[in-house]
Amino acid sequence: MLIEAIAMPIVDDASHEQFSKQPRGSHPLAVGARKRRVVWPDRSTVIESYGSRPPLNSLAKEALEAYVHWGFKNREDGQIELACAPETEAIIFDSNRHGPIESFKKLSDVESPSSVLYGSESDLSPTWFEKQAEMLGVQAEKIDGSHFFLFEDIHRAEKIIRSHFLRSSDE
């Protein structure tokens, strides 16, 4: 099951070349990661802050609480800090410009029943998901919500996942 998967088809040689030649450190997600606040007084302060602004303000309360619970570690001074250092996250976002393209190419190797789901309000191009589905021989399914649609309504997410796995087991 691919859910808002970052597997990007090559649209044309010019866009591929432009994408792969962007200078290191310029990816917007890497820039944002490097600006993250590392140390916080407590988890409730993080929940209040993250839950008050995009993109995490769209998450269900229990999803945001789980994200903060597992995404931060306790410090000896009583405060908490990000479990993943901002620079580590930035390196992941900025490391391999070919990753999404190579991931897309590997979709043709998938032999198991698959699904491709994406959010109706995603900031990613629907074309990505339609092309992924085409590679897998399935229809892309648009779900109401953002890039984080799976975490916006936990009960709906459970139903979506169960229905797709049950459908896959029947194939």
Question: What is the predicted role of each segment?
Answer:
Residues I160-E171:
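C-terminal alpha-helix
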Residues F104-S146:
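Conserved loop-alpha-helix segment in the C-terminal half of the alpha/beta-hydrolase fold
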Residues G145-E158:
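Catalytic histidine-centered segment of alpha/beta-hydrolase-like enzymes
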Residues W40, D123-L124, F151-E152:
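A short, basic/aromatic alpha-helical/loop segment that forms part
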Residues M1-V38, S125-P126:
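Flexible "cap/lid" loop of the alpha/beta hydrolase fold
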Residues S15-Q18, F129-A133, H155-E158:
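Short, glycine/charged-enriched secondary-structure capping and boundary segments
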Residues I6-M8, F72-K73, S120-D123, S146-F148:
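Short, solvent-exposed loop/turn segments at secondary-structure junctions
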Residues A33, R37-S115:
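Alpha/beta-hydrolase
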